[in-house]
């Protein structure tokens, strides 16, 4: 079985048991307590804790992508040096929210590993909690009692946290053989590799209170997890996950890039790279970006660790981005968004590689120099300098030292890091904007925050208070043809914030204003000069024409929010937005996709409000007063004591610092272009208005005319319907041709024998036709419908074989059962992966019967 087959087999198996198959949730969870989704149950956490109601149906199955590379669950240091640690992995799981419990969960698990995966029963062992007599007794109906081991809380009790849902768990182990693993730790419960855990079944049956007391849950739940990487290696007869088809194609690519063959014993660097490129590719494809903190910093650490291992292999130029194609080839079939994001992911990786490779040589030189003075502990000061100056994450330095049997003074490193953070915090207390690099503190102390006048004025005379280079360092002047940042005493340019893009425009006769952003309370404009600028210059500023279109889209976003609450429900809450001159994007909390009818109602309501018109009203008031007045505020947003409230008649009222139209009739028209999901419980609407909507309508008309021309019809809809009918007819002919080919037969003792799998048609009709055409006939047909249901039927005419026994024999190979009369019988099956085996065995069964 290849990895894709295992993934599909698992999901299909549990779908056949009534589970709803759900897609993998994002790697960045909607959970402030976690850096990344690190287990299959994370997307369902709020269901297990009772924060949200049980879904329908209350049983689910998934193949969840996971990252463990930060926080409590951090496997980064071990990756590459063990057979099974990974930063990125896929977790197969089935979940029951108060529906079935231990009996069914254990039965499903045993059936899947023994009948679908076909793992030898004499290689399997299980563990249960020492107090879980119920699980022990259930398991004893499937496996010999001497193969069931009891362990305590450390091994067989699971809980989310200090309080909340928890319960005993049961693990399934695979014996890799004493002939391969015979260290003192290779026993059940030991740390050796002989007995390998492949599946963990968690029985959430208790609620733990703050005092540690366990109380039975009224509706116990099931949470299971099986690592795809582990089970793939086992099925392929490999003792290391990295030797399986999930990783070897990547390792082979690394070997090509470095020009050195891979040898397992000395191949840690190959394994690190093959693991890390999966994490980096998936995180970037899902929208995480390289950063100096948080998830973005973990992403950077993973990539830089891989780059350093490439350096060890002699690769001293960007190479990780070249591996993205292979990741997409291996995994893009199931995770199709990888293919869509491939080009952007490669570009981001290459840029990050170039940045680090520019400093890695100097950093390694410092490392080697300091190493000469190190006996056992590498100094924290040197480690901090490697981090602060050369971009070496601490765990990368620790990784290099571990290879030499040394350690780093982490305590001193942490002290220096804390001191740096304290200095930054003191300098920027109350700021909360962007990064702390650059000469912002000096500007704040000298000038304070500059004034934004762009609500009232789109043109103004201003004075240049400061000029900064691209690194935000103070400079006296900016030559013609250069880019830099300008601080004006007063500015009409809106700085990017609240989802609205920053203004562009011009310094009349001097420069183009490309963008405007806010840094620690300072409104700074990025400019490209056509004439020299210097500090103290008196200049004329003019906001670009994009501002008007941006304002229309921002006001339309407020109307969209109000319409969603009116049509879909008041539970709708903004989860993010992006407003530009030619489009808007609005993310909102909602558990499912909007229907076509809901989308139309929302769009119609917004346009109705636009036609009717309503004046904009802005007020500055106390935060609590604003909330009491009914103004909508973002739940996670931090507001000042005084806030700006924007309202449009009785239609909309929100806390907002952005720019808007004076009357909503200025928006013109509004059109929703897309509704999609962002993550569990978050939906996204993309839309256009004003000129962008007009341009879209024109493009639709042009496409319609092109379609008419292509179809040679003035009524393209009717032409398409006609084409669909013709295509259906051709498909039917193709299916019939396939069936005709499939029904080729053998001659056995003057009996026409046919055993086949067919794509379409009525099985009974085909069998009757076959029997009518031949004096002596024996036919068995297998068919799988669109939902994966397997149907079998057998027919016999004037031949020494019984249809009932024959079809039952075939069905049992497919994990099902059936029977019937001697001349005609039917059955059902479950395991589509065994169809070829069923056909071969059924032919042999019939041969033996007919040749007697």
UniProtKB/Swiss-Prot annotation:
Catalytic activity entry: tRNA(Ala) + L-alanine + ATP = L-alanyl-tRNA(Ala) + AMP + diphosphate
InterPro entries: aa-tRNA-synth_II/BPL/LPL, Ala-tRNA-lgiase_IIc, Ala-tRNA-ligase_IIc_anticod-bd, Ala-tRNA-synth_IIc_core, Ala-tRNA-synth_IIc_N, Ala-tRNA_ligase, Ala_tRNA_ligase_euk/bac, DHHA1_dom
Subcellular location: Cytoplasm
Cofactor note text: Binds 1 zinc ion per subunit.
Cofactor(s), names only, from the UniProt record: Zn(2+)
Matching PROSITE patterns: AA_TRNA_LIGASE_II_ALA
Keywords in alphabetical order: Aminoacyl-tRNA synthetase, ATP-binding, Cytoplasm, Ligase, Metal-binding, Nucleotide-binding, Protein biosynthesis, RNA-binding, tRNA-binding, Zinc
Pfam families from the UniProt entry: DHHA1 (PF02272), tRNA-synt_2c (PF01411), tRNA_SAD (PF07973)
GO cellular component: cytosol
Main enzyme class: ligase
Listed EC numbers: 6.1.1.7
Residues annotated as binding Zn(2+): 554, 558, 656, 660
GO molecular function: alanine-tRNA ligase activity; aminoacyl-tRNA deacylase activity; ATP binding; tRNA binding; zinc ion binding
Acyltransferase listed as a keyword: no
Entries under PANTHER family matching the protein: ALANINE--TRNA LIGASE, CYTOPLASMIC, ALANYL-TRNA SYNTHETASE
Family to which this protein belongs: Belongs to the class-II aminoacyl-tRNA synthetase family.
Family annotation (HAMAP family): Ala_tRNA_synth_B
NCBIfam families: alaS (TIGR00344)
Function noted in UniProt: Catalyzes the attachment of alanine to tRNA(Ala) in a two-step reaction: alanine is first activated by ATP to form Ala-AMP and then transferred to the acceptor end of tRNA(Ala). Also edits incorrectly charged Ser-tRNA(Ala) and Gly-tRNA(Ala) via its editing domain.
Protein name: Alanine--tRNA ligase
Organism: Campylobacter concisus (strain 13826)
């Amino acid at each position: 079985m290849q990895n894709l087959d295992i993934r599909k087999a698992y999901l299909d198996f549990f779908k056949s048991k009534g589970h709803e198959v759900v897609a993998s949730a994002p790697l960045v969870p909607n959970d402030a307590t976690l850096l990344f989704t690190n287990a299959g149950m994370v997307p369902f956490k709020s269901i297990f804790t009772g924060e949200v109601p049980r879904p329908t149906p209350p049983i689910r199955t998934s193949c969840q992508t996971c990252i463990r590379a930060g926080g409590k669950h951090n496997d980064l240091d071990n990756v590459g040096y063990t057979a099974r640690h990974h930063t990125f992995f896929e977790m197969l799981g089935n979940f029951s929210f108060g529906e079935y419990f231990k009996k069914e969960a254990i039965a499903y698990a045993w059936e899947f590993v023994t009948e679908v995966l076909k793992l030898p029963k004499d290689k399997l062992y299980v563990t249960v909690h020492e107090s879980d007599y119920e699980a022990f007794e259930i398991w004893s109906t499937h496996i010999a009692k001497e193969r069931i081991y009891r362990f305590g809380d450390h091994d067989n009790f699971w809980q989310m946290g200090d309080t909340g849902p928890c319960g005993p768990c049961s693990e399934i182990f695979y014996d890799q053989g004493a002939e391969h693993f015979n260290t003192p730790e290779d026993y059940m419960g030991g740390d050796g590799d002989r007995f390998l855990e492949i599946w963990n079944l968690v029985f959430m049956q208790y609620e733990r209170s703050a005092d540690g007391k366990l109380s039975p849950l009224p509706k116990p739940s099931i949470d299971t997890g099986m690592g795809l990487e582990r089970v793939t290696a086992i099925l392929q007869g490999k003792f290391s996950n990295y030797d399986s088809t999930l990783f070897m194609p990547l390792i082979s690519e690394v070997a090509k890039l470095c020009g050195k063959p891979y040898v397992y014993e000395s191949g840690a660097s190959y394994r690190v790279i093959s693991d890390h490129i999966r994490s980096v590719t998936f995180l970037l494809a899902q929208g995480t970006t390289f950063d100096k903190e948080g998830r973005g910093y973990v992403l950077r650490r993973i990539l830089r660790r891989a780059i350093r291992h490439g350096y060890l292999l002699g690769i001293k130029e960007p190479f990780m981005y070249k591996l993205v194609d292979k990741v997409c080839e291996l995994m893009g079939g199931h995770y199709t968004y990888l293919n869509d994001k491939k080009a952007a992911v490669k570009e981001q990786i290459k840029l990050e590689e170039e940045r680090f490779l520019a400093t890695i040589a100097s950093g390694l030189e410092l490392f080697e120099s300091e190493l000469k003075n190190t006996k056992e502990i590498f100094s924290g000061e040197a480690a901090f300098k490697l981090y602060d100056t050369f971009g070496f994450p601490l765990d990368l330095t620790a990784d290099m030292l571990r290879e030499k049997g040394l350690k780093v003074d982490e305590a001193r490193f942490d002290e220096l890091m804390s001191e740096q953070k304290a200095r930054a915090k003191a300098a920027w207390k109350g700021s909360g904007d962007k990064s702390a690099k650059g000469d912002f503190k000096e500007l704040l102390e000298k000038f304070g925050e500059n004034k934004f006048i762009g609500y009232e004025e789109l043109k103004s005379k201003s004075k240049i208070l400061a000029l900064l280079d691209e690194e935000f360092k103070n400079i006296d002047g900016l030559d013609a043809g250069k880019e830099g940042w300008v601080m004006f005493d007063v500015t009409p340019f809106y700085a990017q914030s609240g989802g609205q893009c920053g203004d562009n425009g011009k310094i009349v006769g001097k420069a183009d204003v490309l963008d405007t952003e806010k840094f620690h309370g300072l409104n700074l404009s990025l400019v490209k000069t056509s004439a020299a600028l210097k500090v103290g210059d008196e200049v004329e500023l003019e906001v670009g024409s994009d501002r008007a279109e941006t304002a229309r889209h921002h006001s339309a976003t407020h109307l969209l929010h109000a319409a969603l609450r009116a049509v879909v429900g008041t539970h709708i809450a903004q989860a993010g937005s992006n407003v530009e001159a030619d489009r808007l994007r609005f993310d909102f909390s909602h558990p499912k996709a909007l229907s076509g009818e809901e989308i139309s109602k929302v769009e119609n309501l917004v346009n109705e409000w636009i036609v009717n018109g309503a004046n904009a009203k802005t007020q500055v008031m106390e935060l609590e007063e604003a909330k009491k007045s009914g103004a909508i505020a973002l739940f996670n947003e931090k507001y000042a004591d005084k806030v700006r409230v924007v309202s449009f008649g009785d239609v909309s009222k929100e806390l907002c610092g952005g720019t808007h139209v004076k009357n909503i009739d200025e928006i013109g028209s509004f059109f929703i272009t897309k509704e999609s999901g962002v993550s569990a419980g978050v939906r996204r609407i993309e839309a256009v208005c004003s000129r962008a909507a007009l341009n879209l309508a024109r493009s639709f008309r042009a496409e319609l005319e092109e379609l008419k021309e292509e179809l040679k019809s003035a009524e393209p809809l009717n032409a398409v319907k006609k084409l669909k009918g013709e295509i259906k007819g051709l498909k039917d002919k193709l299916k019939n041709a396939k069936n005709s080919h499939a029904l080729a037969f053998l001659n056995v003792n003057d009996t026409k024998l046919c055993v086949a799998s067919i794509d379409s048609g009525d099985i009974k009709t085909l069998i009757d036709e076959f029997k009518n055409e031949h004096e002596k006939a024996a036919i068995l047909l297998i068919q799988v419908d669109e939902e994966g249901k397997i149907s079998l039927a057998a027919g016999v005419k004037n031949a020494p074989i019984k249809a009932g026994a024959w079809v039952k024999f075939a069905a049992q190979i497919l994990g099902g059962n059936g029977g019937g009369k001697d001349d005609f019988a039917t059955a059902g099956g479950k395991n589509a992966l065994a169809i070829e085996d069923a056909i071969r065995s059924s032919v042999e069964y019939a041969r033996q019967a007919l040749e007697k």
